[in-house]
C-alpha cells in the first residue's frame, strides 16, 4: 500500500475544524484494550458439515469494496467517495469470487461498515447475506462520526471473520497507536486491532485470529503490532487449533527487495533515498527498523499457508500498486504483483496453499487460501 501524502497532511490541518465540531459525542471512537467484538448472523442459514476432517481457510484485504479505483488514500488518485452503484458491483464481484472458492472460514481486512465513502453499506452483513457464510464478527480499526477532510465524512472500517459455524466468542484486542504523530493527528488516525474468535467447528477446539498491522509508521509500531499478534496466538491453548492471518504489511524474512519507491511513487514524487524525511518511503520502504528482515521469523515457526520455500516466488506476491496503465481495459503484466504482505499461519499442517492472483481487478491485495488438515483423533 502506498502512502498518500495528502491524507497524512490532512490530519494535521484538522485542529480548528475539529475543535469547532466537537460536542458531547466524541468524533472518534477510542477503544478499550480488550472488548467484545460485534457479532453478525446471515439473514438465512445454509447447511454445514457436521464433522469436517479439513477446512479451507482464506484471508483477503478487500479494500473496502473499492476494487481498483485510484483512491486518494492508498494510490495516486483523487477519488474519495464511490457511488452506491460502484460499491454494489464491486461487492457482487467479491461475493462471486468467494462463492467460487468456497472457503469455510474467511479473514477479511478493510471492510467498511456504514461509511460514507462506500454508500453507508454494512459490508459484513452484505457479504453474509450474499454468500453461504452463516456467522460473522467485526472489529473496527477506524470509527469516526465525521472526518472533515476531502469530504470523507463518516468512516467505520476494520477486520472481520466470516464462518460457516457459529462464532461463540469474539474479542477486539487493541494494538498500540503510532508514536510518530502529533496528538491531533493520532486522535483522528486508525486504531488497529487483533480480532480473536472462537468458532464452534464440530469436534474441535478452534480459534480464528485476524489482524491488519500498520503500514506507514516510521517508529517501532509495526514491530509492536506483529509481536502482539504472535503473543496472542502463542497464548492459545496448545490443545486447541488456530488459524491466524491477515494483511501484516511486512515482507517475508527472505525478501530480496525492500525499497519499492519506484513502483509506488506518484508522478510528482522523487525517490531520493531520504528514508527519514521523504514521506513516500513511509509505506514503500521495508527496512526502517534495526532488524526488520526478521519481523515475521517467529510466525514462521508455525505452519504457513505458503511455505517459506515458496513465499518469495512471484506467483505468491499478494500486493499490487495501482498505475496509470490500468486505465487500459484488461491491463495486466508480469510485474503486476510486486510483494507479499498477506499471510495465514496455524499450529497444524496446511496443504494446497494458493495465492489467487487472478482476482487482480477486485482489490489491491490478492486472497491467500489453504486447506487445514485436522489430525486424526
Residue ranges of model-derived segments:
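Sec-dependent bacterial lipoprotein signal peptides
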Residues: 1-22
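N-terminal, active-site-proximal structural segment of metallo-dependent hydrolase catalytic domains
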Residues: 22-156, 376-377
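Metal-dependent phosphoester-hydrolase catalytic domains
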Residues: 25-45, 233-243, 250-377
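Beta-strand-turn-beta hairpins that frame and shape the catalytic cleft
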Residues: 48-57, 155-169, 183, 188-211, ...
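Active-site beta-strand/loop signature of hydrolases that rely on acidic residues for catalysis
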Residues: 55-62, 93-120, 162, 197, ...
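Solvent-exposed loop/turn segments at secondary-structure junctions
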Residues: 62-65, 111-115, 141-145, 167-168, ...
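Surface-exposed cleft-lining segments at the edges of enzyme active sites
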Residues: 78-83, 111-113, 177-186, 212-219
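Conserved S-adenosyl-L-methionine
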Residues: 136-143, 170-176, 354-359
Amino acid at each position: 500500500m502506498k502512502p498518500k501524502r495528502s491524507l497524512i497532511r490532512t490530519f494535521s490541518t484538522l485542529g480548528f475544524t475539529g475543535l469547532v465540531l466537537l460536542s458531547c459525542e466524541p468524533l472518534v471512537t477510542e477503544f478499550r484494550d480488550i472488548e467484545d467484538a460485534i457479532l453478525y448472523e446471515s439473514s438465512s442459514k445454509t447447511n454445514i458439515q457436521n464433522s469436517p476432517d479439513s477446512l479451507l481457510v482464506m484471508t483477503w484485504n478487500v479494500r473496502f469494496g473499492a476494487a481498483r479505483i485510484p483512491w486518494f488514500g492508498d494510490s495516486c488518485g483523487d477519488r474519495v467517495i464511490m457511488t452506491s452503484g460502484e460499491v454494489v458491483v464491486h461487492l457482487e464481484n467479491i461475493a462471486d469470487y468467494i462463492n467460487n472458492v468456497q472457503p469455510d472460514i474467511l479473514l477479511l481486512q478493510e471492510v467498511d461498515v456504514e461509511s460514507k465513502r462506500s454508500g453507508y453499506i454494512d459490508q459484513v452483513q452484505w457479504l453474509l447475506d450474499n454468500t453461504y457464510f452463516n456467522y460473522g464478527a467485526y472489529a473496527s480499526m477506524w470509527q469516526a462520526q465525521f472526518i472533515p477532510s476531502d469530504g470523507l465524512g463518516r468512516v467505520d472500517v476494520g477486520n472481520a471473520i466470516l464462518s460457516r459455524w457459529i462464532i461463540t466468542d469474539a474479542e477486539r484486542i487493541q494494538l498500540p497507536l503510532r508514536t510518530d504523530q502529533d496528538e491531533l493527528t493520532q486522535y483522528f488516525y486508525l486504531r488497529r486491532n487483533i480480532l480473536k474468535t472462537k468458532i464452534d467447528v464440530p469436534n474441535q477446539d478452534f480459534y480464528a485470529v485476524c489482524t491488519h498491522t500498520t503500514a506507514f509508521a516510521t517508529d517501532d509500531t509495526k514491530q509492536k503490532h506483529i509481536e502482539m499478534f504472535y503473543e496472542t496466538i502463542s497464548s492459545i491453548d496448545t490443545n486447541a487449533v488456530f488459524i491466524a492471518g491477515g494483511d501484516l504489511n511486512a515482507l517475508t524474512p527472505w525478501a530480496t527487495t525492500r525499497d519499492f519507491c519506484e513502483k509506488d511513487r506518484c508522478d510528482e514524487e522523487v525517490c531520493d533515498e531520504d528514508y527519514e524525511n521523504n514521506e513516500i518511503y513511509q509505506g514503500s520502504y521495508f527496512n526502517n527498523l534495526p532488524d526488520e528482515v526478521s519481523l515475521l521469523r517467529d510466525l514462521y515457526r508455525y505452519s504457513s499457508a505458503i511455505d517459506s520455500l515458496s513465499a518469495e516466488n512471484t506467483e505468491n506476491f499478494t500486493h499490487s500498486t495501482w498505475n496509470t496503465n490500468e486505465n487500459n481495459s484488461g491491463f495486466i503484466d508480469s510485474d503486476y504483483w510486486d510483494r507479499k504482505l498477506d499471510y495465514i499461519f496455524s499450529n497444524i499442517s496446511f496443504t494446497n496453499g494458493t495465492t489467487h492472483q487472478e482476482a487482480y481487478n477486485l482489490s489491491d491485495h490478492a486472497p491467500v487460501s489453504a486447506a487445514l488438515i485436522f489430525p486424526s483423533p
